[in-house]
Amino acid sequence: MKIRTEDELQDVIDSEIAWRKKELSAVKANINTAKNTALRAGITLLYAHWEGAIKNLAYYYLVYVSSLKIPYNRLKPNFLAITLKNDIRHFDETQKVTFQTEIVNKLLCRYNQGSNIPTENIISANSNLNSTIFTEIMSAIGLPTDEYEK
């Protein structure tokens, strides 16, 4: 998927939200006729849409930011962390200073370069979008969660 402009990002977001609204409206209309069953189904469907929308919208945003190729020094640190995720994981596992130095050099060199942010397998709700996972997803794309917290 390629999302290169704000208009393309807005179009894909609008499309994502529109079909979800349509489906939820249909369930809401059914609730009046078959209250208990439809209400239980509606709650399950609402949760599924909430989880799916958050994952997909975060992914679309990540694809968009990735396509801009903005230097890492102009992005929030989370984008460099995503890029160096595997290297960072190996940093702690190895006892070799040469390998650790190589990782640090990679980090320092990339800081001023145009970004090459991976987008696949970054956003996941682990089939359970709770507040902790929501915060992780928002952090992955560099957005604050303050206004969602009590």
Task: Name each model-derived stretch.
Residues 1-44, 57-63, 67-68, 72-78:
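Charged alpha-helical initiation segments
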Residues 43-52:
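Long, contiguous alpha-helical bundle segments
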Residues 46, 58-150:
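Helix-loop junctions and short alpha-helical segments
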